[in-house]
Regions:
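N-terminal signal peptide c-region/cleavage motif recognized by signal peptidases
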Residues: 13-14
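Non-cysteine beta-strand/loop elements that form the S-adenosyl-L-methionine
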Residues: 295-313, 401-412
Length: 551
C-alpha cells in the first residue's frame, strides 16, 4: 500500500480527538451555589454542538478522558472575568487621543497635549482630573481654563474630556466653532463654568458638554473599527471575556454585531442602549437576547440621573460640604425618571440607572419602586454606581430586588475628594459595598473603564483592601466595607454574569457553559492582599479559543 493512501485510511479509521484537556492547572471556579471549587483539569469540547464549551472539571488524580492534552504547568486558571460597567468604545478611543490620565499638574497636562497634537483636525484628549493636580505643593482643585488650553493649542479647536466623562475642557477655538458666547444659557441638567464676568471659562459639565460636542466632526467607520479593535485587545490583555457596555447607540450596536459575525469580537458584550431613543432604534420589537454564539445581547437601557462627584454634578440631598452654593445637577426629574423606567420595564427591558449623589439614588429607587414586584424580579433592574446612598435608602436594594452595580476602584480613587465633598455624616452610606451585600442585595462589580483602568485585578485589590495601589491608607479606607476575596471573585464572575442575564452561559466553568477562562502569573487566593493589583493575566480564552497570550 502506498504511504499516502495508508495515511488517509488511518486518519479515516481513527476517531478524532474531540476534546482539549488543560491539565495540571491550579483551577478555581464557583458552582451553582456559590461555593468555591478547585480542579486540576479543564475539559473543553472541540467539536459537535458543545464546541467551545466546558465538558468537565476534574480533580487531581482523576482518570482523564481521551483528548488533546495541554500541560498548564501549575498555572492558576480562573473563569474569564466580566466587567459589569464599562464604556467599550471609549476604552479604545483612549489609545488614539491624548491621554491625560495620571497627570499631576496643569503644566504636565499641557505638555502631553502639546506633544500629542495631530497633523489635522480637532485636538482630542481624555483623562484629566483637577483633583489630582498640584502646584507648588498645593492642590489646584479648580477647573482648568480655555486660556490654559490655548497656550499649547493655538487656534486649533481642542476638547479634553474629564476622567469621568462628565466634563469637557475646551479652548476658545472650540467655543467659537460651537457658537458659544457669554449669552449662551446653561441647559437643563448641565452647567457652563464661567469667570467672574460671566464669560464661559472653558469647562462644560454634563448636559452642557453637548453644546460643544455637536461641533466636533464625527469619526468615520474605519477609525471606529480601529477604536473597537483597540478596546478588545486591551480587554483580552487584562482577562476580560465580557463587559457590560453602559450606554451605546445603534451605530455601535451594529458594529458589535458585525464584529461578532466576522469572528472578530473577542469579548461578550452585554449592551445597554443609551436612553429611550437608542433603545427604540436598536430594538424596536423588544429586548435582543444573547445571540451569535452568545457574543452580544441588548436587553437593557441605561439612564443617567445625575452627574459625577468630581465635577460636583452628583445630585445631593443637602449642599456640598466644600461648595455650599450647590447640590449638584439633577439630569432627570423624578417623574421623568419614573416614566422612563416603568415604560422600558413594561416593554421587557432591564433598566440601569446611573446614580451617584444621595438624592439621585433616592429618586432612582423611587422609580424602581413604581415597577410591579414580579416585573422587578424578572428584569433585574440595576443602580449603576450606587455611590452615595442615604442610610434610610440602603435597605431598598434588597427590598426592591435592585442590583447594585458598583466599581471598587472608585472608592479608592475618590476617598480624599469624597471626604471634602461630603463630610463625615454622608460618608456612612458612601461606597457601602459590605452594607449593601449584608442587607441581602446582590452586587455586580466593574471598573467604569476608561474612567478607571480596565484591569479587574485592580478592582479585586480595591474591594479586598479598600486601599489605593500605593497601599494607603494603612488598614484601608472605611475598612468595614471591605469584601472578602471570595466575594470579589464572585463580583467579577457569577454576580456580573447574573446582572447581564447570562448566568446559564458564563461566569463559572461548569459543564455546558462557554469555556471562557484565563490564566494568571500568581494565585490571587494565596497572594498577599496588597499585591493583588500586581498580578498579570498570562493568557485569555473565549469559547475555547485563545485570544491573548502574554509575551
Amino acid at each position: 500500500m502506498k504511504p499516502m493512501l495508508f495515511a488517509i485510511l488511518l486518519a479515516t479509521a481513527a476517531p478524532a480527538l474531540a476534546d482539549t484537556l488543560y491539565t495540571n492547572a491550579n483551577g478555581y471556579t464557583l458552582d451553582a451555589k456559590g461555593t468555591l471549587q478547585r480542579f486540576a483539569t479543564l475539559v473543553v469540547a472541540d467539536s459537535g454542538p458543545q464546541q467551545g464549551r466546558v465538558k468537565a472539571t476534574l480533580k487531581a488524580g482523576a482518570a482523564l478522558p481521551a483528548g488533546t492534552r495541554i500541560d498548564m504547568q501549575g498555572a492558576t486558571l480562573w473563569p474569564g472575568l466580566i466587567d459589569a460597567h464599562g464604556h467599550v468604545m471609549r476604552l479604545g478611543e483612549l489609545k488614539l487621543v491624548v491621554n491625560l490620565r495620571d497627570t499631576a499638574s496643569i503644566a504636565e497636562a499641557q505638555a502631553r497635549i502639546k506633544a500629542g497634537i495631530p497633523a489635522v483636525g480637532w485636538i482630542m484628549g481624555r483623562g484629566w482630573n483637577q483633583e489630582r493636580w498640584y502646584e507648588n505643593g498645593k492642590l489646584v482643585g479648580r477647573f482648568p481654563t480655555a486660556a490654559e488650553l490655548d497656550a499649547v493649542t493655538g487656534d486649533r479647536p481642542a476638547a479634553m474630556s474629564r476622567v469621568d466623562g462628565h466634563a469637557l475642557w475646551v479652548n476658545n477655538a472650540a467655543m467659537t466653532a460651537a457658537g458659544i458666547t457669554k449669552d449662551t444659557p446653561d441647559p437643563d441638567g448641565g452647567q457652563i463654568i464661567r469667570d467672574a464676568a460671566g464669560n464661559p471659562s472653558g469647562v462644560f459639565v454634563d448636559k452642557a458638554m453637548a453644546l460643544v460636542a455637536r461641533a466636533i466632526p464625527a469619526d468615520d467607520d474605519a477609525r471606529l473599527d480601529l477604536v473597537l479593535t483597540k478596546s478588545l485587545e486591551t480587554m483580552a490583555e487584562v482577562g476580560l471575556t465580557g463587559a457590560h457596555d453602559a450606554g451605546m447607540d445603534k451605530d455601535t450596536w451594529d458594529r458589535y454585531v458585525r464584529f461578532a459575525k466576522a469572528g472578530k469580537l473577542t469579548a461578550r458584550i452585554y449592551a445597554m442602549a443609551g436612553g429611550p431613543e437608542n433603545r427604540k432604534a436598536i430594538a424596536p420589537n423588544g429586548p435582543i437576547p444573547w445571540s451569535i454564539n452568545d457574543l452580544v445581547a441588548m436587553q437593557a437601557m441605561k439612564l443617567v440621573s445625575d452627574g459625577a462627584l468630581g465635577s460636583r454634578g452628583a445630585y445631593l440631598i443637602a449642599p456640598y460640604e466644600d461648595m455650599p452654593s450647590t447640590r449638584g445637577l439633577e439630569i432627570l426629574k423624578p417623574e421623568q425618571l419614573k416614566s422612563l423606567v416603568t415604560d422600558a420595564s413594561r416593554d421587557g427591558f432591564q433598566v440601569n440607572v446611573h446614580a451617584i449623589g444621595d438624592q439621585a439614588n433616592r429618586s432612582t429607587m423611587d422609580a424602581f419602586a413604581a415597577v410591579p414586584p414580579a416585573e422587578r424580579i424578572a428584569r433585574r433592574h440595576r443602580n449603576e454606581h450606587a455611590q452615595i446612598v442615604d442610610m434610610a435608602d440602603l435597605g431598598r436594594f434588597a427590598s426592591l430586588n435592585v442590583i447594585a452595580s458598583m466599581q471598587p476602584t472608585h472608592a479608592t480613587s475618590d476617598k480624599g475628594m469624597a471626604e471634602a465633598r461630603l463630610g463625615e455624616a454622608r460618608l456612612k452610606g458612601a461606597y457601602a459595598w459590605q452594607q449593601i451585600k449584608t442587607s441581602g442585595a446582590q452586587l455586580a462589580l466593574g471598573s467604569d473603564f476608561p474612567v478607571e483602568p480596565p484591569d479587574p485585578m485592580f478592582g479585586i485589590h480595591a474591594a479586598v483592601t479598600r486601599q489605593s495601589r500605593d497601599g494607603l491608607p494603612a488598614g484601608g479606607w472605611r475598612p468595614w466595607e471591605k469584601l472578602s476575596m471570595l466575594d470579589a471573585f464572585a463580583g467579577f464572575t457569577t454576580w456580573a454574569a447574573r446582572a447581564g442575564h447570562a448566568e446559564a452561559k458564563v461566569g463559572t466553568l461548569e459543564p455546558g457553559k462557554w469555556a471562557d477562562f484565563i490564566t494568571l502569573e500568581r494565585d490571587p487566593f494565596t497572594a498577599p492582599p496588597g499585591d493583588l493589583w500586581k498580578i498579570k493575566v498570562t493568557a485569555t480564552w473565549l469559547g475555547g479559543k485563545q485570544v491573548f497570550k502574554r509575551k
